[in-house]
């Protein structure tokens, strides 16, 4: 059990048979009446967002999520297959369960798979990944006066803005949280 006073961004609770993650919260103490906590909750399974208000000190069931490190081994149709490298047990996730994470997911990558009641809910990517540029416009000499950027499509299909001097085949580091270029990767 968790009190609504203890809500923080990222806290997970069980509500109406589903798992919800606190995206925003605000403790409100009006001049008249009792205090309350106004929250914005995101459903972990579906991604829908709702605003909900709780009484201050209201007790709620905290969702106990388990994280396990699995390796993405291959695709089978529309399913992503992951393997626990210690037990060699396979876990299958649909494209819907993977969500936006699939644009950075490549075979052989290790990720955290979050489960609740032994059901996989979502995939947590590392904060940054190294990917190869598959397609981009060639850089034109002398076109860097303003330090401009150009779109690049990576080997997984993700699109990020990269500096003009980068070309096809180069490996770059990308921040998976906000889809930004972090730098070149050597080696």
From Swiss-Prot:
GO biological process entries: peptide biosynthetic process
Chain's role: Involved in peptide bond synthesis. Stimulates efficient translation and peptide-bond synthesis on native or reconstituted 70S ribosomes in vitro. Probably functions indirectly by altering the affinity of the ribosome for aminoacyl-tRNA, thus increasing their reactivity as acceptors for peptidyl transferase.
Name the record gives this protein: Elongation factor P
InterPro entries per the UniProt record, alphabetical: Elong-fact-P_C, NA-bd_OB-fold, Rib_uL2_dom2, Transl_elong_fac_P/YeiP, Transl_elong_KOW-like, Transl_elong_P/YeiP_cen, Transl_elong_P/YeiP_CS, Transl_elongation_fac_P
Pfam families to which the protein is assigned, alphabetical: EFP, EFP_N, Elong-fact-P_C
Molecular function GO terms recorded: translation elongation factor activity
Family: Belongs to the elongation factor P family.
Source organism superkingdom: Bacteria
Species name: Synechococcus sp. (strain CC9311)
Compartments, as annotated in UniProt: Cytoplasm
Keywords: Cytoplasm, Elongation factor, Protein biosynthesis
One cellular-component annotation, GO: cytoplasm
Pathway note: Protein biosynthesis; polypeptide chain elongation
